[in-house]
Amino acid sequence: MAHDQSSRYANLDLKESDLIAGGKHILVAYKMKPKAGYDYLATAAHFAAESSTGTNVEVSTTDDFTKGVDALVYFIDEATEDMRIAYPIELFDRNVIDGRFMIVSFLTLVIGNNQGMGDVEYGKMIDFYVPERAIQMFDGPATDISNLWRILGRPIKDGGYIAGTIIKPKLGLRPEPFAQAAYQFWLGGDFIKNDEPQGNQVFAPVKKVIPLVYDAMKRAQDETGEAKLFSMNITADDYHEMCARADFALEVFGPDADKLAFLVDGYVGGPGMVTTARRQYPNQYLHYHRAGHGAITSPSSKRGYTAFVLAKMSRLQGASGIHVGTMGYGKMEGEGDDRNIAYMIERDECQGPVYFQKWYGMKPTTPIISGGMNALRLPGFFENLGHGNVINTAGGGSYGHIDSPAAGAKSLRQAYECWKAGADPIEYAKEHKEFARAFESFPGDADKLFPGWRDKLGVHK
């Protein structure tokens, strides 16, 4: 049985409202269950100790100052498994170079050793609150979706839906076919991203692919009269490799460098990779991909943290945009209520699962919607979210269109315009060919979402 530390690391008389008003603590909410035979409060206190100044025994080197920065359990509800801990902001590591906060220190404390404690069955972080002073000390985004809207010639407020795709197949295209796939989409759409495994494969080296992609962009811009955007994957183990890829691409794009975003796989690569991109390339849109996150964020996982927490951290780190799933409308795990993830990262204040968070003017992070989306699924998605100020990267939804990738891109745009106009999708399809052909391209979705569509659109098997 662990040493009971509740007299030091718990104070259930503390009021959450007072802690928030004081502005000196980061508050973290968990779902925590002790292992059988362990007391809830004692386990919670041990959890707080391991997450701050303590260990499993008293040590002789502890002094009064140390006790002043203890993390404190201030709320528990054993029946609902709710546990909340207040962490003094002095606990968290600061940069030597500029005194700023870092997410690695936050993660090390609030979701570090406590994930492997012998008396804890599970503990999952579901929300956290950051006071104004700590908000000021995180980098936050340098660019946001308004920068992209400006490039696209749109209003910088409520500039609307950015129709994007992912080059498919995700691997196996050589440089010329890769660039041709980009060109075909750009004839109808706005934004292309590398799929997360695409980098510098021997059959598609970066130094051959990127010049061809830029040439494809210029040709598409000339043909359509519209600006185009490309998000390049610079994910790598090594800082110098990341910068080598980024610097090469910036040189290639030259006068169109503002149309180049940098994608980092922030979950597998870690916070250091996100910060490298944010600080070394503050003029570029920072595209946070989250491959692998489901290992801990999935509702089926009892440990780690939620997708909501991951997205909220990404804004602090400086992500211009982060993938947030499809809220139950695509192929990825999720549900309609996940829209709160989008609201938290795009608004200046928002109610989370537990805490009301103010961002004090920190730039927003764009929700990026990806994973099994196509034109037929978009109207319902927008209705659930309540707006269309997102980037949507639809790979299969574009390259799977029966006519062409350009037609697929146009069908995505038309789906947004359909929702924006409050139109009936079937009636809208009758006047918009690419959207109508999306019904034939994705008949399984059409049957499920719009029963009777064949007769209404005059399409027969």
Swiss-Prot record:
It comes from the Bacteria. RuBisCO catalyzes two reactions: the carboxylation of D-ribulose 1,5-bisphosphate, the primary event in carbon dioxide fixation, as well as the oxidative fragmentation of the pentose substrate. Both reactions occur simultaneously and in competition at the same active site. The record marks K331 as: Transition state stabilizer. Substrate binds at N113, K170, R290, H323, S370. This is Ribulose bisphosphate carboxylase. It comes from Thiomonas intermedia (strain K12). GO terms for biological process: reductive pentose-phosphate cycle. It catalyses: 2 (2R)-3-phosphoglycerate + 2 H(+) = D-ribulose 1,5-bisphosphate + CO2 + H2O; D-ribulose 1,5-bisphosphate + O2 = 2-phosphoglycolate + (2R)-3-phosphoglycerate + 2 H(+). Belongs to the RuBisCO large chain family. Type II subfamily. Mg(2+) binds at K193, D195, E196. Binds 1 Mg(2+) ion per subunit. CDD domains: RuBisCO_large_II. The active site is at K168, H289. The modification N6-carboxylysine is found at K193. Its cofactor is Mg(2+).
